[in-house]
Each structure stands twice: as C-alpha cells, then as structure tokens.
C-alpha cells in the first residue's frame, strides 16, 4: 500500500464481510481463513476473495504456516485509518466479542486444526 485514501477505506469497510474480518483481526490479532469462515459463517471462496481485496489495499498482511495462511492487520496502516478502524471496533465491540466467544466454543481460535483439517 503506497497511499490509502479515505474514500478507498470507506469503500472497503462498507462491505459487512470485510468489516467483520477487519474487526475480528483488530480484536484477535491474527486468524486463518478457516477461523474467519467459521466466525462469519461464510464460505471459504467468499472469505478468500475479501481477504485478497483487503491484502491488495494494504490493510492486511499474511503469513503461511504449513498449508494455512494467517492474516493480521498491517502495522503500516495510516494513523487516521487505524483510528477509524478502532472507532468502528468500539461501536461493534459487543457483537465482535460475541463472535469471538462463539469461535472459542467451537475451539477454532488458537487451534485451527479442528476446523482447517
């Protein structure tokens, strides 16, 4: 990401799935595709398409670990964009934390092998 404009960020975050991905990563730090699919109740191809857009925008970074790809928010997000994401998280905090609790109950987060195998 060389330069993220406000209109680009708002277009990206206007999609409910992309916003959910960003807020979950803001809450948990890092998740694999299968965790995101489970958390957001979306198919792997749909989540992967959204992750690609987020990665191309520079909002996300990924790392491979074996056959899994883990995603996290980029530390290079402009400060103004990070503030917007943080405020969005504050507005959706209860919803995001409920999703996180559900993910933990399904034993996905932290042990992706249960879902990702």
UniProtKB/Swiss-Prot annotation:
Q: Which Gene3D superfamilies match?
A: Winged helix-like DNA-binding domain superfamily/Winged helix DNA-binding domain
Give coiled-coil spans as residue ranges: none
Asked whether the keyword Transmembrane is assigned, the reply is no
- Stated role: Transcriptional repressor for the arsEFG operon. ArsE is a trans-acting regulatory protein which controls its own expression. The repressive effect of ArsE is alleviated by oxyions of +III oxidation state of arsenic, antimony, and bismuth, as well as arsenate (As(V)).
Name of this protein: Arsenical resistance operon repressor
- SMART domains membership: HTH_ARSR
Lineage, top ranks: Bacteria, Pseudomonadati, Pseudomonadota, Gammaproteobacteria, Enterobacterales
**Ranges for the HTH arsR-type domain?**
1-92
Query: Which key words tag this protein in UniProt?
Result: Arsenical resistance, DNA-binding, Repressor, Transcription, Transcription regulation
| GO BP of this protein | DNA-templated transcription; regulation of DNA-templated transcription; response to arsenic-containing substance
* Superkingdom as given in the UniProt entry: Bacteria
What do we know about how this protein assembles, alone or with others? Answer: Binds DNA as a homodimer.
Q: Carries keyword Transcription regulation?
A: yes
Pfam families given in the database record = HTH_5
GO molecular-function term, one example from the UniProt record? DNA binding
DNA-binding region per Swiss-Prot/TrEMBL record: 33-52
């Amino acid at each position: 990401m060389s330069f993220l404009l406000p209109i680009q960020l708002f277009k990206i975050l206007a999609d409910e799935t992309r916003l959910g991905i960003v807020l979950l990563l803001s809450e948990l730090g890092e998740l694999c595709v299968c965790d995101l699919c489970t958390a957001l109740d979306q198919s792997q191809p749909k989540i992967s398409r959204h992750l690609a857009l987020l990665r191309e925008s520079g909002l996300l970074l990924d790392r491979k670990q074996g056959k899994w790809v883990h995603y996290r928010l980029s530390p290079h997000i402009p400060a103004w964009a990070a503030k917007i994401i943080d405020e969005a998280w504050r507005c959706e905090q209860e919803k995001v934390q409920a999703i996180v609790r559900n993910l933990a109950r399904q034993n996905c987060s932290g042990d992706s092998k249960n879902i990702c195998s």
